[in-house]
């Protein structure tokens, strides 16, 4: 052990004594809980920095300075110790490593491989925390959170750059990820697709005007194609039960008794890309193929009435039953109700319930005939007749995909709530904040990492990413985690090993963490 390591150890012991005095000394007797908690957090960060610095110093101490052999059989002599900076959650730290070199061959730093360091200065933990925050918050707010919480200054550019680098392996991760166990799947395989516009910056913007004209915008929108695949258990419903639920009407007692618990999607996977419909559906088909099999009894494809999307869904999923999203169909009924009765008419809801029941009972052809006849009746205003004709035409074109009575009898889903929610939450809520404009590459990187987070693959993906990076940089397998390190990482609380620590003092026991709680899936909650 070098004198430098000994010095660091002495400083750590002094700082630990300071920690003890901070919580038990004379001044602590007059302090508030908030003062102690805030001060303790800062002191622990400083202590963590010293401990991590000691770790690096000791690893450098034990690293051999003897000449090394390269993979090609060449010999590199020890040249000097060289420094690199390491930005950790505890702050900026120096790492000194032995550097081996031979003129004409270049140099190597074996300790970088042993420590599994990346190409830049940011630690993997800091990257993962900032990126997890970044997929849900604007980048400058992510920097503000890190500054307030950890006292770190991470620029918006650094966050965006790290996300771009770490999103590069998402496609290969999902390509190698095995399909869910058939025993964990339900019998209905469902695919959904829809589009959502994302505001982009102009690639070659003209000279910006002093003031925008009416209708002018500083950017343009490009469609992000959002896709989803999952399995779900059959849930048989009647048209009337759906109407009762949809319009919040009070069901009868017998209907309540017969109503089953709501089925939930199993192993739902979502994705979004601006590369176009064909690229999105090709990838979706690749995801679907390994999940299909004898355990799947039904195959359903849900989308809205947009013809180009319907044609592509039929092309890429020919064995699936294409269903028009019932919510989109019902929106056309609402437009007719508003045109005929007005939004404040007391009988509008009753009219909607009546015609919705007809649609769900697969009597859409009768509704079409009624609307077409009304559209020819001159007693109605021109706008009313136009809306009747528009809705009738829409229903006529989508009639092959509107056999809702059969779908409900088989227990199939008829509404694309999963994909509608994904378009809103997955894309809109992050990409369409006020004044926000994206480059296509920037939003693709964000959406890839956002998909990893939303699909529940965050930790697994970053383990994969680190292994892939290690092979690229050092052409060797990623170092195995030692049992002691795994124990420290997996140990959520020292109180778990001392369950009587609280009860022995007459206090309520501290509950064990709930593995299902979202908090404990955050990178900081280890």
Annotate each predicted stretch with a short phrase.
Residues 1-57, 97-526:
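Catalytic center-proximal scaffold of phosphoryl-transfer enzymes
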Residues 56-119:
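An N-terminal low-complexity regulatory-tail signal and nearby short nucleic-acid-interaction modules
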